[in-house]
Design a protein with these regions (language model features):
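Acidic/glycine-enriched connector segments
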Residues: 11-145, 152-155, 159-177
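Divalent-metal-activated hydrolytic enzyme cores
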Residues: 177-183
Length: 183
């Protein structure tokens, strides 16, 4: 029954024991920031998943099957956004200048659900510094499953590259952390 909230286990992720960096990444699979997070996780063989609209709907058509996403029962973007916020421990929003549309909704849902939120303005930092900020956020808030959100590609053409670089660097930090026995 897809009307019931997912658990991290249903998404294929484990909240696991305490550690310094996340054990899984989720997003809604939209073009831009969402898909970049999944691409970075898949490239690093890092656990990922999340919720997407029914029919795997995105602005570029159907979200490719290579992205391990579960479908909500409706085609509404807000429903999948709400599920990803609720089923994660905290959210990273990567954006440029101002929050708008679904990105603004994600921030509002985090506040409503009392979920930790880290905002990264690409105009104010570079991907390496941003990843360190996110690592500190994840550590401070005890986040095991990190939701990643931000503008779709049509709203910010650089969202894919910047977000992929941030999440890729974060996952490299996670690997180094694990290699040093901190996980």
């Amino acid at each position: 029954d897809r009307s019931c909230p997912a658990t991290s286990g249903e998404l294929g992720l484990s909240r696991g024991s305490e550690g310094r960096l996340p054990q899984g990444v989720v997003s809604g699979g939209q073009t831009g920031a969402d898909r970049a997070a999944l691409d970075a996780a898949l490239e690093a063989a890092f656990p990922c998943g999340g919720w997407c609209p029914c029919g795997r709907r995105a602005e570029d058509g159907v979200i490719p099957a290579r992205y391990p996403l579960l479908e909500v029962a409706c085609t509404d973007y807000p429903e999948r956004t709400q599920r990803n916020v609720r089923d994660s421990d905290g959210t990273l929003i990567v954006y440029r200048r101002t929050l708008s549309g679904g990105t603004r909704l994600t921030a509002a849902l985090c506040r409503r659900e009392h979920k930790p939120l880290q905002l990264i303005d690409a105009d104010q930092t570079d991907p390496v510094c941003a990843a360190r900020t996110v690592a500190d956020f994840v550590t401070r808030e005890g986040i095991r499953v990190l939701n990643v959100a931000g503008p779709r590609a049509s709203g910010w053409p650089g969202a894919q590259a910047f977000s992929c670089a941030v999440v890729g660097e974060l996952l490299a930090l996670a690997r180094a952390d694990a290699a040093n026995g901190r996980r």
